[in-house]
Curated annotation (Swiss-Prot):
Designated gene of the protein: ribH
One Gene Ontology molecular-function label: 6,7-dimethyl-8-ribityllumazine synthase activity
Family: Belongs to the DMRL synthase family.
The species this protein was found in: Leptothrix cholodnii (strain ATCC 51168 / LMG 8142 / SP-6)
Cellular-component GO terms for this entry: cytosol; riboflavin synthase complex
Keyword match Repressor: no
Lineage of the species this protein comes from: Bacteria, Pseudomonadati, Pseudomonadota, Betaproteobacteria, Burkholderiales
Keyword Transferase: yes
EC number: 2.5.1.78
Designated name of the protein: 6,7-dimethyl-8-ribityllumazine synthase
Length: 154
């Protein structure tokens, strides 16, 4: 999603879209910033606040299950995954990063719903803060673009 605003359609229109966000609470201050910038961008793109569903889960490994439940409802044009995984001293970082990313992709493919994945995987807290605003906005833009594309392709 790096530079998601480059090479996209000149105007992204989210005015007719319903979007759901699943936010992991682990590293809460960072994921709150991701959510704040994501929601602000969705609204700037025309998504009505009443059409944005925002739920939280304990951590990155729980994001996919909530996404799956939302996808099964078939009430949303796009979903967004928000989280922050910071490398520690053990193998746990790789496990959580790999499994959460694969699970998000699996839900998207199995349900045919676009999911913008903004679960940050970073080496340290400074890297997370440096990305929180931009990646939240990028996730919103990706969700709107892909929802519109899926509508065009159907």
């Amino acid at each position: 999603m790096k530079n998601a605003d480059r090479g996209v359609a000149a105007e992204l229109d989210g005015s007719d879209l319903r979007v759901a966000i699943v936010q992991a609470r682990f590293n809460a201050a960072i994921t709150e910033q991701l959510a704040s910038s994501c929601i602000a961008e969705l609204e700037a793109l025309g998504v009505l606040a009443k059409h944005i569903k925002h739920v939280t889960v304990p951590g990155a490994l729980e994001v996919a299950l909530a996404l799956q439940a939302l996808a099964e409802q078939k009430d949303h044009d796009a979903l967004i995954a928000l989280g922050c995984i910071i490398r520690g001293e053990t193998y746990h970082f790789e496990l959580v990063a790999n499994e959460s990313g694969a699970a998000v992709t699996r839900v998207s493919l199995e349900h045919g719903v676009p999911i913008a994945n903004a679960i940050l995987t970073v080496e340290n807290e400074a890297q997370a803060w440096a990305r929180a605003d931009e990646k939240g906005r990028d996730a919103a833009r990706v969700a709107v673009e892909m929802a519109n594309l899926m509508e065009d392709l159907s």
